Amino acid sequence: MSSFGAGKTKEVIFSVEDGSVKMFLRGRPVPMMIPDELAPTYSLDTRSELPSCRLKLEWVYGYRGRDCRANLYLLPTGEIVYFVASVAVLYSVEEQRQRHYLGHNDDIKCLAIHPDMVTIATGQVAGTTKEGKPLPPHVRIWDSVSLSTLHVLGLGVFDRAVCCVGFSKSNGGNLLCAVDESNDHMLSVWDWAKETKVVDVKCSNEAVLVATFHPTDPTVLITCGKSHIYFWTLEGGSLSKRQGLFEKHEKPKYVLCVTFLEGGDVVTGDSGGNLYVWGKGGNRITQAVLGAHDGGVFGLCALRDGTLVSGGGRDRRVVLWGSDYSKLQEVEVPEDFGPVRTVAEGHGDTLYVGTTRNSILQGSVHTGFSLLVQGHVEELWGLATHPSRAQFVTCGQDKLVHLWSSDSHQPLWSRIIEDPARSAGFHPSGSVLAVGTVTGRWLLLDTETHDLVAIHTDGNEQISVVSFSPDGAYLAVGSHDNLVYVYTVDQGGRKVSRLGKCSGHSSFITHLDWAQDSSCFVTNSGDYEILYWDPATCKQITSADAVRNMEWATATCVLGFGVFGIWSEGADGTDINAVARSHDGKLLASADDFGKVHLFSYPCCQPRALSHKYGGHSSHVTNVAFLWDDSMALTTGGKDTSVLQWRVV
């Protein structure tokens, strides 16, 4: 016996007699068998090697429109800039190319463009490291051409999150305003190039949604949000505020957006669907367009030609207004894309629209809008890659199933299903896709037509894994009811019939891998058990020697000899949500609860193996998979709802 690591427990124990390694998760022993060919030379003290390959972020799927605003702009480079998770995305629609600013370490909440149209400010939320150390909220100022970070503001100053940021527009843009999410929603003004705070003041007890400098008067700022609009004057290092007076007009629950017209008018949109015009320099309403939208006015954009565009929430309309506030043109955004969140001006009469369903659309009020960026709307867990094409499927809590092309970065199709989805798996032919949901229902879909082939129910709990055997003869369905249901499969995945169920786990099924020859499969469960099964009989295989030297078609189980090096010291067994082995058997990628994707060498069987580590996701990373040819890895986010595509380099 030799043990490794002088932690509180012996973290890993190697037994030569049994040919096994035992690791401990939360004090629970997890025994793992060493294949005969590795056993004679195996030692816990061998240093693990870093993988020779790395990951480079190539594409980000998604946009954060659900709960953020004023976060979509066109740059002179022809790129639109927006954010999702902790990534600021610069997307050249013409060249179908993305660049990424990766300076943030947690969710980005706001974005502003400097008048020079090159410098960008982004603000982020407070985060925590894997070790539980706080990561303070702050603003990063960066160059959109070189992607280099120029300045970092407010470390230790902001509380909870930075929710609004804006550059001054007239005096060379040398000031930056920011609002945080502390109880007092502190408004601060910074000389950003010197990284010094000029002044700060309590803004409001209520939510603040917008903070912006006046375009021509560098001493005036406007903030608005829940039941308020304030006009601020910056003088001699202090800020004084005047409240916007609604007088005879109904005071809205929320003032949602603000923009400035050439003559100096300030225009606001509110939750009551009204546009209010505040005369130049004043805090009184000089003109009102009541009921401009049915439901809230979420976005306003003043166009170069002096007209104004507004975007509606409930009514999903984009409306063009003349300089006298008469309606010139309107168009409705299709329901699937969701309510309008923000509107940005493009070249010519092109507009870009961000929606609350995390999509970005391109078009005009004359022609209507088409999809540019498709997003998921809620937590994502299901991910599977096509066995022979550059395609992958994602599905999640939002009941959406998308089949994507990793080349065109667009969905080939999307389908809404009845239940929130949790898992997905392709038949080896690639023509049928299984999708598991949280209710115990699971479906078979035709990947070409996206028609429903079949629908089945096993138990009434979440289906955490659906996996076809490599020979296509079986389908294993792992459930939170601790059982694996086994089906025989005919007609290329179109016909399935239940063979039986595998009972033996004392906790829910988390992961499942098939043997290369389809003769057995292995499962992991919520209490860190590893069990082996014969699909033909649905019986547990209890002989260690029967499975010790088995070649596995995949490595998605987070517990097993080939992968146990992914676990860090003192890890909780729920810290790692998913692993995936590259098809050439050389790489292993893991997805963890700390927003990180790790890349290891495979096999990964030395304790605490070395890895390359990548950020981009901002909450738990829920799944990971390699494309069929190993050219790319894909990862899905939980709360951040994003899908990241990484080139293997």
Curated annotation (Swiss-Prot):
Pfam families: Beta-prop_EML, Beta-prop_EML_2, HELP. One of its GO terms (biological process) is regulation of microtubule nucleation. It comes from the Eukaryota. InterPro entries: Beta-prop_EML-like_2nd, Beta-prop_EML_1st, HELP, Quinoprotein_ADH-like_sf, WD40/YVTN_repeat-like_dom_sf, WD40_repeat_dom_sf, WD40_rpt, WD_repeat_EMAP. SMART domains: WD40. Changing V484L: In a colorectal cancer sample; somatic mutation. WD repeats lie at residues 56-93, 97-144, 151-192, 195-234, 241-280, 285-323, 369-406, 410-447, 452-489, 495-535, 564-602, 609-648. Keywords: Coiled coil, Cytoplasm, Cytoskeleton, Microtubule, Repeat, WD repeat. Belongs to the WD repeat EMAP family. Tubulin binding protein that inhibits microtubule nucleation and growth, resulting in shorter microtubules. Contains a tandem atypical propeller in EMLs (TAPE) domain. The N-terminal beta-propeller is formed by canonical WD repeats; in contrast, the second beta-propeller contains one blade that is formed by discontinuous parts of the polypeptide chain. This is Echinoderm microtubule-associated protein-like 2. It comes from Homo sapiens (Human).
